[in-house]
Each structure stands twice: as structure tokens, then as C-alpha cells.
Amino acid sequence: MIKRSLFKIAFSAQWGRQMRFITGPRQAGKTTLAREKLALELCEPMYYLWDRQDVRARHRANELFFTQDRPPRPEIPWVCFDEIHKIRRWKTTLKAMFDSVGDSYRFMITGSAKFDVVKRAGDSLAGRFFTFHLSPLALREVEGRAEVTVPPDPTVFMEDRLSAPDCPEGLTALLAG
């Protein structure tokens, strides 16, 4: 399997408990990326494709249906809702789920490029998610050079950059106080 650059970035702990929205064109590998994360975290049963009637029926019967499938590990499992944007009131549905159990689960939401309507999510999902766009394979990924460095904490980054030997003396003086 080809390692994707976005994997390490999107699933970094630095994003906290917020939902991860993975968008992109058809066949870019969104579902594969999600399933890879679930497998890595021992959460394979926590994948739900909202095109399936049984998933929708379970949701109608119990809004938090996925909690019945919770694996014994990890302590905070990942759950993936693929194509949830195809149901009516999907934003309200996600908000209710996240607000109810967002401290006990990590959510990843996948959908096609049309899913970028999340930019208009407004108040219902404000502050509850980060969006990541998965592009088709990049040459470096095909060549096996997908590793990227997750950006450090902004404060640490600035301190490191400003105290670097090639940094102008004036900026170094600012750091000293």
C-alpha cells in the first residue's frame, strides 16, 4: 500500500479532539486512508458508509448506534462516517454525536470534493472540525517518499527560527528580552 503524506498530518494529536474532515476527488484514496487509520488503531468495526441502508436504519433506531460497536481498545477509539453528507441534516447529526461523545471518540468524516460544503457549515459545527484535502497520488508518494514533518507548536517553531545562527542579530536580541 502506498503511504500517503496526509496521514501523519491529519491524524496528529496536535489537532486535539476535533473531527477530521477528509475531502477530495473521487478515487483519491479517502476511504483507503480512513480504513488504514482504523486498522492501525484496532477500530475496523467503526467504519460506517452512509450509502448503506442498514447504517441509516441503525442511526434512526439509536442516534449513537456506533457506541454499541466500541472495540475494547484503544481507550479513545476512532470512528469513520463515510459519505454522511448524503443524509438530510447531516451537520445537525454530526453536531449531536460529537457533543454527546466527542470526549470518548475521535471522528473522521470522509466525502467527495463536493463535500466542501463544510465551509458553509456555519455555527452548527463551528470549532468542532478541521478539514484536510486529499489529492490524487503525488510523485513523492509513488516513489515512497511520503513522510512529512508535522509542523511544531507555533511558539516553539518561532523560537527555534529566531534563535537560529542565520537569524539577524536584531531578532535574536528581541528574544532575549
Predicted regions and their residues:
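Pre-Walker A adenine-sensing motif
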Residues: 1-14
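Hydrophobic anchor at the beta1->P-loop junction of P-loop NTPases
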Residues: 22
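P-loop (Walker A) phosphate-binding loop of NTP-binding proteins
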Residues: 25
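Conserved lysine of the Walker
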Residues: 30-31
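Short glycine-rich substrate-engagement loop in P-loop NTPases that contacts/grips substrate
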Residues: 45-78
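Conserved P-loop NTPase "ATPase switch" module shared by AAA+ and STAND
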Residues: 72-90
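Conserved catalytic/switch belt of AAA+ P-loop NTPases
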Residues: 91-115, 122-123
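Interdomain motor-coupling "hinge/lid" segment immediately C-terminal to the ATP-binding subdomain
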Residues: 118-177
